[in-house]
């Protein structure tokens, strides 16, 4: 069994050694331009077209939760990957726990009005503020995949009213489910906090725009943990300036790194982190990949395969 590996920033040698330990029968090598030797599996992140084109692979593993970089290249270069080759993504591998930590900490930050107290502190102003009531602090989650379900579970512990919106209806206990474009307005109407965990697909690009933000209650909050392309940044800035949106916590952006001239950096109601809400944990990823390869070799059904038509 031959495995090729490519990631522009990961410690390649660590991955090769870890994969050797997890799959002793495999020959693992770092892919470099010009390497046209045969391979059974490819582990990749933002791979060059030539790495995958023309290969008779058993499967490709994206080394992250998203596969949009691969699918976008496939649109321009359909020869990059045969339709018959299954494409897998890392559905969790520790990312769910990280998303839970990030989302819960920020929701509580807003719920306890720490953002308002920070602004008061900046002007040396001492003034206790009225508390928010949990029953009026509905949290809405855009996207109900693996990570969305993890975030919902963690927030249920804090007894906030919860709702989700997705392509198809969910039957999660203690959570109100909305599905399809026809139910999006009703979903948004009660969301004091909107958490975005949608996949990046042609249908979701630019979905958080002026029209969507106007349907939120006045003074709502936005937490974007998915992709920067989901948000029309100028529309968000306008909503923040008008007070329609009271605060935004943004981990992802249309351009990364976020350019120094972006007005988001200096906006008093915006908090920025550099795409760190959930990162790939190498040991857990190797465990998932090795188990999945073993299942594929046995002809068993496996989880995590991407539906290329849907984009996730």
UniProtKB/Swiss-Prot annotation:
Its EC number is 1.1.1.79, 1.1.1.81. Catalyzes the NADPH-dependent reduction of glyoxylate and hydroxypyruvate into glycolate and glycerate, respectively. NCBIfam families: PRK15469.1. The keyword Ribosomal protein does not apply. It catalyses: glycolate + NADP(+) = glyoxylate + NADPH + H(+); (R)-glycerate + NAD(+) = 3-hydroxypyruvate + NADH + H(+); (R)-glycerate + NADP(+) = 3-hydroxypyruvate + NADPH + H(+). It is an enzyme of class 1 (oxidoreductase). The keyword NADP applies. This is Glyoxylate/hydroxypyruvate reductase A. HAMAP family: 2_Hacid_dh_C_GhrA. Keywords: Cytoplasm, NAD, NADP, Oxidoreductase. Gene3D superfamilies: NAD(P)-binding Rossmann-like Domain. One of its GO terms (cellular component) is cytosol. It comes from Escherichia coli O81 (strain ED1a). GO terms for molecular function: glyoxylate reductase (NADPH) activity; hydroxypyruvate reductase (NADH) activity; hydroxypyruvate reductase (NADPH) activity; NAD binding. Pfam families: 2-Hacid_dh_C (PF02826). PROSITE patterns: D_2_HYDROXYACID_DH_3 (PS00671). The active site is at 227, 275 (proton donor). Coiled coil: none annotated. Belongs to the D-isomer specific 2-hydroxyacid dehydrogenase family. GhrA subfamily. It is found in: Cytoplasm.
